[in-house]
């Protein structure tokens, strides 16, 4: 009985896929990073001829692009907010330059379709963009070798100081005049034997 249900499920999935009811617009990669900026891609169906694409940052309209066809198939593009964009047959890409952590937020693409009729409004895709500060990473890259070199130098200096101090302490304890042991002078054995011969 289970193989029957799995076959029915696979068959229904293939029918949805072939008829285009499966919406793959939300499965695209929305954010990509280029040269210190962020590219936000909003996809739409290729059959759309006239559209209005809006990029929302939370509830604020950040970018607004309208593509219409006039007489003689002339394409008119209006970009009242002067957002840098790139338009293709099935997507609009908006560019946010000099991305920093203050631009991290929830972004949403909203599509209004004028042609082909009927008029439709869709929220296509959304995602949360979190930008980490890259300057902190660069500072860490600089300070990491400097910190390691300073640590090695301090360790080397400490070892040299300990060895020097140990040698100094050893030398001072050997020649200490206040020691209870007296230094013995070297005795010449030849003189000793002569003295021994005189007494006998």
Curated annotation (Swiss-Prot):
Q: Which UniProt keywords apply?
A: Cell membrane, Disulfide bond, Glycoprotein, Immunoglobulin domain, Membrane, Signal, Transmembrane, Transmembrane helix
Localization per Swiss-Prot or TrEMBL:
Cell membrane
Task: Kindly list every residue the record annotates as glycosylated.
Answer: 89, 123
Chief subcellular location equals membrane
Output the GO biological process annotations, alphabetical, semicolon-separated.
Answer: cell-cell adhesion; T cell costimulation; T cell tolerance induction; T follicular helper cell differentiation
GO CC annotations on file: external side of plasma membrane; plasma membrane
List residues of the Ig-like V-type domain. 30-133
Ranges facing Extracellular side:
21-145
Signal sequence, start to end: 1-20
- Any one Pfam family here would be V-set_2
Function of the molecule = Stimulatory receptor expressed in activated or antigen-experienced T-cells that plays an important role in the immune response. Upon binding to its ligand ICOSL expressed on antigen presenting cells (APCs), delivers costimulatory signals that enhances all basic T-cell responses to a foreign antigen, namely proliferation, secretion of lymphokines including IL10, up-regulation of molecules that mediate cell-cell interaction, and effective help for antibody secretion by B-cells.
Could you identify this protein by its name? Inducible T-cell costimulator
Per the UniProt record, the source organism is Rattus norvegicus
**Gene that encodes the chain:** Icos
């Amino acid at each position: 009985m289970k193989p029957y249900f799995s076959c029915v499920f696979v068959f229904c999935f293939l029918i949805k896929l072939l008829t285009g009811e499966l919406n793959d617009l939300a499965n695209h990669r929305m954010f990509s990073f280029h040269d210190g900026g962020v590219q936000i891609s909003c996809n739409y169906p290729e059959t759309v001829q006239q559209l209005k694409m809006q990029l929302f940052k939370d509830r604020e309209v950040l970018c607004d692009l309208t593509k219409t066809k006039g007489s003689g198939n002339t394409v008119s593009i209006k970009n009242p907010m002067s957002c840098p964009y790139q338009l293709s047959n099935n997507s609009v890409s908006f560019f946010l330059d000099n991305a920093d952590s203050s631009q991290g937020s929830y972004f949403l693409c909203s599509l209004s379709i004028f042609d082909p009729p009927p008029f439709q409004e869709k929220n296509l895709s959304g995602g949360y963009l979190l930008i980490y500060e890259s300057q902190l990473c660069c500072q860490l890259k600089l300070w990491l070798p400097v910190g390691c070199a300073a640590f090695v130098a301090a360790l080397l200096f400490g070892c040299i100081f300990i060895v020097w101090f140990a040698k100094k302490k050893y030398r001072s304890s050997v020649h200490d005049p206040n020691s209870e042991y007296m230094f013995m002078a070297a005795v010449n054995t030849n003189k000793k034997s002569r003295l021994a011969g005189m007494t006998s």
